[in-house]
């Protein structure tokens, strides 16, 4: 009913429900991206995902529908509070409070609110967000690892779905990942325009 209310045209409602089905609830923040991901993997009973910049375990999650189907994977976020919530709700998953990048070192993370989807390690994005929310972030030292190192440590040899949502740190994240080695079936990356 909520979807029908938001889609004014019956044509778009019919198109939407024919593509995604009538009774799926979207947990993603914006456009039901998680419904597309779920539809893409409709033939997969089980699988694995890596969610870099996972934020909350349900709300705005692109992997929660997969988790509900029995999938498991690795959730990574710079917000300790977000990872603590993931540990409670997503018990099958590995939940890591780290940053991902091309170099392994201790870096500054910029935390505006505990579960803010705008927390970042990117200095330009920090300034953009600071102006948007009119608040200075808390600067928290955090370990940054290469995604390859994390996957090796947890013996993840196959990734069905890779999601990257890291507020300006996308290229740095990808530079620590061997795409050809892991060859995910589907990759989604939230990219912000110049901030």
Where are these regions (language model features)?
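Phosphate/nucleotide-binding beta-alpha loop and adjacent structural elements of enzyme active sites
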Residues: 1-195
């Amino acid at each position: 009913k909520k979807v029908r209310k938001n889609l004014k045209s019956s044509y778009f409602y019919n198109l939407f429900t024919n593509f995604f089905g009538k009774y799926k609830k979207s947990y993603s923040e914006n456009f039901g991206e998680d419904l597309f991901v779920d539809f893409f993997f409709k033939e997969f009973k089980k699988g694995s995902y890596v969610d870099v910049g996972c934020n909350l375990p349900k709300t705005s999650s692109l992997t929660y529908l997969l988790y509900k189907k029995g999938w498991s994977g690795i959730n990574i976020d710079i917000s300790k509070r977000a990872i603590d919530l993931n540990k409670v709700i997503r018990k099958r998953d590995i939940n890591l409070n780290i940053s991902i990048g091309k170099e392994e070192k201790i870096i500054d993370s910029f935390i505006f609110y505990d579960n803010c989807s705008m927390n970042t390690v990117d200095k330009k994005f920090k300034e953009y967000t600071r102006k948007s929310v009119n608040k200075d972030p808390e600067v928290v030292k955090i370990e940054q690892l290469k995604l390859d190192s994390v996957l090796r440590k947890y013996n993840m040899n196959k990734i069905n779905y890779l999601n990257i949502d890291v507020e300006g740190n996308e290229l740095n994240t990808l530079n620590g990942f061997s795409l050809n080695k892991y060859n995910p079936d589907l990759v989604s990356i939230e990219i912000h325009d110049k901030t």
